[in-house]
Amino acid sequence: MNNFFDTIIFDLGGVLIDWNPLYVYRKIFKTEEEIEWFLENVTTNEWNENQDAGYPLHKATEELVAKHPEWEAEIKAYYGRWLEMLGDQLHETVELLHQLKQSGKYKLYALTNWSAETFPHALKRFDFFKLFDGIVVSGEEKMKKPSAAFYKIIIDRYHLDPDKTIFIDDSLRNVKGAETVGITGIHFHNPSQLKEKLQRIGIELF
């Protein structure tokens, strides 16, 4: 079994990188309840995902301000202070990535839902990107997970065999999306759980 898989694809946010709007909005709002309401009703996940799929940040911001003028300053903070949302790398998972690279047995890729406008900031900040054999960014491709077509981009571009490929993501929806194109998915919860899952399916770690 340990000779079966030869490719591992990583999600970034929530797996290798700590990104969270709370880092900004805890400085703006007084209570967690206010933050929760704002993120669920104004700058929603669905809204942010549109930009992950390539919609321009300035247009998205202008349109949302027009819809919710009473929240203009708070809405503009979302992308205006985006760098403050970008936390540290998740060290234990990055260490796993290093171990996989050092083994020399696996091709390593990243497949991320991320705006093409903000992704360069992450690329500059984190050294571990050099470990990847390829990176596919939703904002550059104008499509995103869990669309089957998005997974097929990375398969076709790098000539991957889905049957020999593992995909790791903290979103179950995205894991299931990968499985629709024949990739083996792992729903990420924490580094220890990931390490156990990888070893269980025959991936060799130091």
Predicted regions span which residues?
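Alpha-helical elements of Rossmann-like donor-binding domains used by nucleotide-donor carbohydrate transfer enzymes
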Residues: 23-24, 46, 59, 63, ...
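Short beta-strand segments
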Residues: 9-11, 109-113, 169
